[in-house]
Amino acid sequence: ETDIPYCIPAGDMGAQEDWCPENSSEGFKGMITLKSALANSINTVSARLMHRVGPQPVINLIDKLGVDTENIPAVPSIALGTPDLSLFEMVSAYSAFANKGVHVEPQIVSTIVDKNGTVLYQSVPKAKDIISQESAYVTVNLMEGVTQYGSGARLRSGAINNYVYNNVVTGHPYMFKNPIAGKTGTTQNQSDGWFMGMVPNLVSGVWVGGDDRSVHFPSITYGQGATMALPIWAVFMKKCYEDEALNISQEDFERPEDLSIRVDCSQPVEGERQEVELPDELDF
């Protein structure tokens, strides 16, 4: 993809006026891989991709992933996370990617047992194949870039000398070594900060914000998901790993056999066709 100024004209895909998203950082990077663009929250690339796919197929897919789509408009700006979603919905949707394309409906209560040990209620998970194992793996691989060299790199040793993170109460650096896929998120005016994180057998998320969106950080330095929400996720995961009884995975995400999609696009392959035709529907 290409990180250059990009506009979707009024009337196209439900846009009421020309929509020209900007990046949080100044300037543009030119040619960039989709993985790197996602890792660094390059909005122009997300807009370009949405323009190619269209918002309605995206809405159809997330509906199958447990998201209430009734009030989500079919407009291109949803590519930047404009809909109001609950943390419950986000964890539900992300779990399908970690679970090899299978969505399992989350349960608040799994079992009810009386004082004698008799099981009064046992939930039966509702599982459904939503996307292919290959598509799920590629999505996870894309999001691994976020914690490897993107906005979530401080989970490892990234930003180790950044003054913003020095002496914070949550501890830094976090120095995770295991594979982690994730995504930071920041809403308009720094009113909300998100971090969603995945390891092979656990999906968890953190939202920081308030009911009154007029209460927010004055700048993105402290008001972004990487500084508001990610540290809480890091502390939570460290506690999870300290409890060996939880058996939280530190292994790689399982790669499907005969993977047909090349996940390392940093170097073009000689003779490979650069433009591909998009399917009529997303993979569901």
What do these predicted regions represent?
Residues S36-N40, S86-Q274, L282:
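A penicillin-recognizing enzyme superfamily signal
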Residues H51, D63, A98:
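Short polybasic/polar patches that bind polyanions
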Residues E1-V58, H103, D114-G145:
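Conserved catalytic neighborhood of penicillin-recognizing serine enzymes
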Residues I4, P76-I78, Q107-S110:
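Extracytoplasmic/periplasmic beta-strand context in beta-sandwich domains
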